[in-house]
C-alpha cells in the first residue's frame, strides 16, 4: 500500500502535453506537498491515538516508539484478558456440571421420598450387603475401604 492510495490527485497524464518545465515543476511540487501533508496528518492522528502522547508535541520517531510500546502493551493486556475469559469459561463449565449433579441428586432424593424403601427396592450386592435401588448399583460395602474423594481442580481467581 503506498502513501498515495488515500490521496486523490490528478496524474501527469491528464495534463495537456504542451506544459512548460515550470508548470511541470509546480505541479510536481503541489503533489509532493499533498503527500507530505497527508503523512503529517497521519502522524498527528497516530499521536492522538496513543494515550501517553495525546496533545503533546513529539517527533515522528517518538510517535513511532510510543505507538509501538502501546501496541505491545495492548497485546499483553489482551492476552491476559483472554486467559481470564478462558479461566472463567472453565469455572462456568465446572459450576454447570455441579448444578446438573445437584439437580440429579435432588430428583433422586424426591424419588426416594415418593417410594420409601420396601423389600422390592432393596437388593443384595455380590458381597452380600443390602443396597437400595437408588444407590446407582455400587458394588461397594461399608466394610470396604472408603472411596477417595474426587479431587476438583480449583481455578485461580484473580481480581481484575
From Swiss-Prot:
Cell compartments where the protein resides: Nucleus
Composition bias, Acidic residues: 1-13
SUPFAM superfamilies (UniProt xref): HLH, helix-loop-helix DNA-binding domain (SSF47459)
GO molecular function, one term: DNA binding
PROSITE patterns for this protein: BHLH
GO cellular component: MLL1 complex; RNA polymerase II transcription regulator complex
Domain bHLH: start-end pairs: 23-74
Region (Disordered): 1-40, 105-160
Chief localisation class: nucleus
Region (Leucine-zipper): 81-102
Stretches that traverse the bilayer: none
Post-translational modification remark: Phosphorylated.
Biased composition (Polar residues): 121-132
Keywords: Activator, DNA-binding, Nucleus, Phosphoprotein, Repressor, Transcription, Transcription regulation
Record field: compositional bias (Basic and acidic residues): 29-40
A GO BP annotation: positive regulation of transcription by RNA polymerase II
Assembly description: Efficient DNA binding requires dimerization with another bHLH protein. Binds DNA as a heterodimer with MYC or MAD. Component of some MLL1/MLL complex.
Free-text function comment from the UniProt entry: Transcription regulator. Forms a sequence-specific DNA-binding protein complex with MYC or MAD which recognizes the core sequence 5'-CAC[GA]TG-3'. The MYC-MAX complex is a transcriptional activator, whereas the MAD-MAX complex is a repressor.
Stated family: Belongs to the MAX family.
Protein name: Protein max
Native organism: Gallus gallus
Source taxonomy: Eukaryota, Metazoa, Chordata, Craniata, Vertebrata
Record gene name: MAX
Amino acid at each position: 500500500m503506498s502513501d498515495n492510495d488515500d490521496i486523490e490527485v490528478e496524474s501527469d497524464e491528464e495534463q495537456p502535453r504542451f506544459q512548460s518545465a515550470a508548470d511541470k515543476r509546480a505541479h510536481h511540487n503541489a503533489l509532493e506537498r499533498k503527500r507530505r501533508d497527508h503523512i503529517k496528518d497521519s502522524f498527528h492522528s497516530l499521536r492522538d491515538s496513543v494515550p501517553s502522547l495525546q496533545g503533546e508535541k513529539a517527533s515522528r520517531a517518538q510517535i513511532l516508539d510510543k505507538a509501538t510500546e502501546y501496541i505491545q502493551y495492548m497485546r499483553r493486556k489482551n492476552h491476559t484478558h483472554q486467559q481470564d475469559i478462558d479461566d472463567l469459561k472453565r469455572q462456568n463449565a465446572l459450576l454447570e456440571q455441579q448444578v446438573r449433579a445437584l439437580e440429579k441428586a435432588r430428583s433422586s432424593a424426591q424419588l426416594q421420598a415418593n417410594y420409601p424403601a420396601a423389600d422390592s427396592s432393596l437388593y443384595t450386592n455380590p458381597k452380600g450387603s443390602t443396597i437400595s435401588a437408588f444407590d446407582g448399583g455400587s458394588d461397594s460395602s461399608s466394610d470396604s475401604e472408603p472411596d477417595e474423594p474426587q479431587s476438583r481442580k480449583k481455578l485461580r481467581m484473580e481480581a481484575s
